[in-house]
Amino acid sequence: MKRNSRLSLALHTLSHMAGDPDRTRTSSDIAEHAGTNPVVVRRVLGRLREAGLLTSEKGHAGGWRLARVPEAITLADVYLALDERIVASGEDADTPACSVEHELHKRVSNVLQDIERSLVQKLGETSISEVRGT
């Protein structure tokens, strides 16, 4: 996983939030801590909010907070919310005209889809609270 990916940012942020789940954090505070731009943070956290992992409040005392207890947020929840696939499935490729290439593409695509399913299953076995060691 790339250190600057949206997934890394989301997991890092949620892990910190799990340490004090009732605390509200601003995009600017999160961005400063993560060493990135607040706009990037808002985009990533917006996806997590859409997935029901975070809530947000506007205004002077506003910010972001966990929508669930940390034990109820798995790494798979975060991964799926961001729609940032680690395993490229090859589903977007054109159908090759060569029958050998077509069969090869189909089989490799099936293997990659199996890997993706296994990855999501394994990510689902670990919660954000476990990442923190709490």
What do the predicted segments below correspond to?
Residues 1-13:
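Short alpha-helical segments that sit at the start of domains
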Residues 25-35:
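A short alpha-helical element within helix-turn-helix/winged-helix DNA-binding domains
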Residues 32, 49-50:
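Alpha-helical residues within the helix-turn-helix
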Residues 18-22, 68-69:
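Short helix-capping/hinge SLiMs at alpha-helix to coil transitions
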Residues 51-67:
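Beta-hairpin "wing" of winged helix-turn-helix
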Residues 67-134:
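Non-DNA-binding regulatory cores of transcription-related proteins
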